Amino acid sequence: MSRTLTSRQAEELHKSIIAYLAANNLQDSANAMRTELGLGEDAFDTATAKKYETLLEKKWTSVVRLQKKIMDLEAQTQTLQTELNSATPTSNRRGDPSSWLPAGPPRHVLQSHRTPINCVAFHPIFSSIASGDEDATIKIWDWEFGELERTVKGHTKAVLDLDYGGPKGHTLLASCSSDLTIKLWDPANEYQNIRTLPGHDHSVSAVRFIPSGAPGAPLSGNLLASASRDVTVRIWDVTTGYCVKTIRGHADWIRDVSPSLDGKYLLSTGNDRTVRLWDISVPNPEAKLVMIGHEHFVECCTFAPPAAYSHLATLAGVKKPPPASSTAEFMATGGRDKTIRLWDGRGNCIKTLIGHDNWVRGLVFHPSGKFLLSVSDDKTIRCWDLSQEGKCVKTVEGSHEHFITSLRWAPPIIKDKGPGEETNGDVGTPKKAATAPQDVQIRCVIATGSVDMSLRIFSR
């Protein structure tokens, strides 16, 4: 013992052991040890025993805590090493946007909401971001500077979803609510409410502007899709306020909708545990595919961008990926079964991503197509590498202090846009982005909203 402990440390240990034995009614053992060590009664009185009787237990629990911390740190080190190994030699977290992934701490923690945040949406051009909450308010922020710009009021119940888009040259903000309405706001006119769209018979869960360019759609750029607890998807003309199509097929609450990049297809998910793909370019849309596999309500859905086709084709066992000009080739969904599922254009589940410990609430593909990001009620952001068979290569722990309800990636910056190109109504991407990626500059900024009432910005 003398080889590892000093004389004073050894004496402290001996006294602690004697006091522990005495405190646990092992007096004979305590007396024997005291005798062996030559400690008389005067050297180990009642006051000394009281001082040392809990010291051994405290030391023991401290060791256990330290062991746990060491194990946690080793796990974090392993995760970081995995990230490092998966990076290309020339990639740089700060220099290569195609490999950038969010990391803590956030750039900004935006706080002003008084109730849980349900949704967030980036302006396609300016550094504005909107967030909606349970107390019927929408807040507009400058995500670049982390400042609140204004509070927008008009709904009478919880704001459930938000999206920027609309006719070319006239960006609008759409919001939907538990008050059964959709409202359109004009960012160019101090976010005045320019139109209210009634028609749904229950809470409106999701809204998405449909990108321009849908074949056979004379109102391209003017269309908005909505999903509701009334078990319908509706398509609206935002210039007139009329519902131009009502889509039925789900058997329960529809939670989310997502349009394809060309505006021809619409993806929907809900409480009936199905994922449905609709061709909305025809007068009477019918489900082209019904995908079944989730074991609980399906919370979110999104189409994969063409940049992800090569990785997803490999997962699907396809040697040649689909052409970048095609759409609705691959999709991703997340649900309350804690899983993310990747689907091909024939309705086959090509991969199930497991890792979250609670409901999956939001999904977004990395603009490079290599990664898929997800958020969950387990308070984490997870990054899945599609080039490594969907392996989780990064987990941003403690991203929020409560459930994470929403996730968005900032729209790209369009450079040297040529004549004839149009911006995507949702994120400002051009129709030709798939064939001319050099014109698109990735913005390494994501936003998350949470039940903890904060909006957080993660950026490079």
Swiss-Prot record:
BP term (GO), one: microtubule sliding
Gene Ontology molecular-function annotations: dynein complex binding
A Pfam family the protein falls into: LisH_PAC1
Keywords from the UniProt entry: Cell cycle, Cell division, Coiled coil, Cytoplasm, Cytoskeleton, Microtubule, Mitosis, Repeat, Transport, WD repeat
UniProt KW Cell cycle keyword: yes
Residue ranges, compositional bias (Polar residues): 82-92
Family note: Belongs to the WD repeat LIS1/nudF family.
Subunit structure: Self-associates. Interacts with NDL1 and dynein.
Entry function: Positively regulates the activity of the minus-end directed microtubule motor protein dynein. May enhance dynein-mediated microtubule sliding by targeting dynein to the microtubule plus end. Required for nuclear migration during vegetative growth as well as development. Required for retrograde early endosome (EE) transport from the hyphal tip. Required for localization of dynein to the mitotic spindle poles. Recruits additional proteins to the dynein complex at SPBs.
Name by which UniProt lists this protein: Nuclear distribution protein PAC1
Organism: Gibberella zeae (strain ATCC MYA-4620 / CBS 123657 / FGSC 9075 / NRRL 31084 / PH-1) (Wheat head blight fungus)
Name of the gene this protein is made from: PAC1
